[in-house]
Amino acid sequence: MTVAALYDIHGNAPALAAVIGELRADPPDAVVIGGDVIAGPLPLETLELLRGLPWPVHWLRGNADRAVVMSFDGTVPPKLLEHPLYQADQWVATFIDRADRDWLDQLPPVVRLDVDGLDEVLFCHATPRSDEERITVFTPPERLAPILEQGGADLTVAGHTHRQFDLTAGGRRMVNAGSVGRPYEHGPGAYWLRLGPDVELRRTGYDTGAAVARFAAVGYPLADSILAPVDADAIARRYEDHGDEALDPSSYTGVA
């Protein structure tokens, strides 16, 4: 089986549509949607595109999906509501209904699939044990190895930190699929992963300027920052140095 892994779409329907166009030209056998699906400017359009895919789809829940559920339920701690990302999640939650909320809430944290040439692959949002733990291109093998050992797979596919990488630690491999909708990379585009029989880190171009104009037109609170150029290495370093206390990259200036 061949698999396309699409992670961290974050409600960016134009980016998703561009990737789907590539998939239609060279279809996979299945698609993995790796979490953080609708927390972004066009949540319902994004869901409509994904639910219309003609291939088997395996879904994962990400930390932003949990945040949207909490926003729908009104259970976000008041202190977190001061954060721009949680304010944006509050906005997203106004577009979904109870059925969408319940569907997001029941998505699994881990999926295992047999992939051509790669045997069993473990798919998770961040790490096998957490949907928030941050692994970056700078993560040392001694920290990564026990995390991958806990998952038990020779190959683990993840996302969460929005930057592609291919790391090995303790004889196991971890590949980050990148982010379709909000990449923290060295250039624009929609980043994703194709598996079977090899591992292919992919990037699909699309009109980011037109996308940002759409985001602003619908009133998305973070429209100006979602696709703004970033210092990819500075963000990864900050994630690595400060873990889950790192600043939100949408407000990051590139100054250490």
Model-based region annotation:
Residues 168-256:
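Acidic, His/Gly-rich catalytic cores of divalent-metal-dependent hydrolytic chemistry
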Residues 138-175, 180:
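Anionic-ligand binding region
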Residues 2-101:
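Core catalytic region of metal-dependent phosphoesterases/phosphodiesterases
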